[in-house]
């Protein structure tokens, strides 16, 4: 597990995000923090991140805690997390249907996502790591230090 946590720390440090004036947009980091909060609290127990209000509420709460401004919609980082190697969508129909939802670079609306995405899920190893307090804490520290320390 030690080698794998290093891989996921590196993946978190290298999230595909917008950078302006040397600052990384924190949207994906806040979403991951929210997912880890849900795992810690027992809202997520089966590696299924659903398109529902619980993740939305957690994202908005964490955004206000760490960024202290009006939060954007959670569905933008939820959609764009598909660029990360550890984040996956479980399709209602086919993965090709998900790929056809929007043009490259665009964000699918919540309605479109709900028609094609049953839920998102993490690599099993990553999910196992964040279920453990020590692993979750290490990954949270990476996100908070890299994305939120200058706020």
Map each language-model feature to its residues.
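Intrinsically disordered, charged low-complexity linkers and terminal tails
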Residues: 1-151
